[in-house]
Regions:
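Surface-exposed loop/turn segments flanking beta-strands in extracellular/periplasmic regions
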Residues: 1-5, 50-66, 108-135
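Short glycine-rich beta-strand segments
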Residues: 101-105, 190
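Outer-membrane beta-barrel transmembrane strands
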Residues: 3-50, 68-88, 95, 105-109, ...
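Solvent-exposed loop/turn segments connecting transmembrane beta-strands
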Residues: 171-177
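Outer-membrane beta-barrel domain signature, especially the mid-to-C-terminal portions
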Residues: 126, 176, 182-184
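Feature captures outer-membrane beta-barrel proteins of Gram-negative bacteria and organelles
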Residues: 118, 181-189
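Conserved short loop/turn motifs at secondary-structure junctions
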Residues: 100, 166-171
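Outer-membrane beta-barrel translocator/channel fold
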Residues: 194-197
């Protein structure tokens, strides 16, 4: 098709609206204990349509025109709740961190298409036979929930011990295997601190 035909007969429209936001709050219960909460969201919607005029050079099925509409929705929501305790007893320092998090992703999509209209250039899904129409829709949901913790201890900044662990549950895995745990243990010795005493 020549450029003038495309400009006047073939129309495409596309629109996207997006919203993102974050919220966080922290409370100091004491000088050694605090709690925090964070939430974030990312959401957008995309809608587009496409018209092809009758009599163009497109395939035979579209000689009487084609019209399509597509809509896509996306939403991602995350939350994080944490608490931290930091205390010292004599030469020993202790730190305990516990938390939980969620990640929730959802999508929706709808698609409608009609072609070879009964009345050329009248763009309506009702203007095509069932054989010349196609409607489809889909939806998906994914959720990840986790709990985690870390314990740290040291003696005179010389001996250090760290124990941590996290367990996640994923909705995309088979029911019997949705939970998975990964622990970690580490330690260290800074012998040079002994010479500072």
């Amino acid at each position: 098709d020549n450029p003038y035909w495309i400009l006047n007969k073939n129309k495409m429209q596309d629109q996207t609206e997006r919203f993102t936001g974050n919220f966080s709050v922290k409370a100091d219960i004491t000088d050694w204990w605090w709690i925090s909460y964070r939430m974030g969201i990312d959401s957008y919607t995309t809608d587009n349509s496409n018209k092809i005029g009758a009599g163009g050079v497109y395939k035979v099925a579209w000689q009487n025109g084609m019209y399509s509409e597509n809509s896509y929705r996306f939403r991602y929501l995350s939350t994080n709740l944490m608490t931290n305790i930091n205390k010292s007893f004599g030469d020993f320092n202790f730190n305990l961190m516990l938390g939980t998090s969620t990640d929730d992703t959802r999508t929706w999509s709808n698609s409608r298409m009609a072609w070879n209209f009964e009345v050329p250039n009248f763009y309506s899904f009702d203007n095509a036979t069932d054989a010349n129409r196609d409607f489809s829709s889909s939806r998906s949901e994914k959720r990840l929930i986790g709990v985690f913790g870390e314990f740290r201890a040291d003696w005179k900044n010389t001996l250090f011990l760290t124990v941590s662990g996290r367990n996640d549950w994923s909705s995309t895995l088979p029911l019997a295997n949705r939970s998975y745990f990964y622990p970690s243990v580490s330690g260290s010795f800074v012998f040079t601190e002994l010479f500072n005493e």
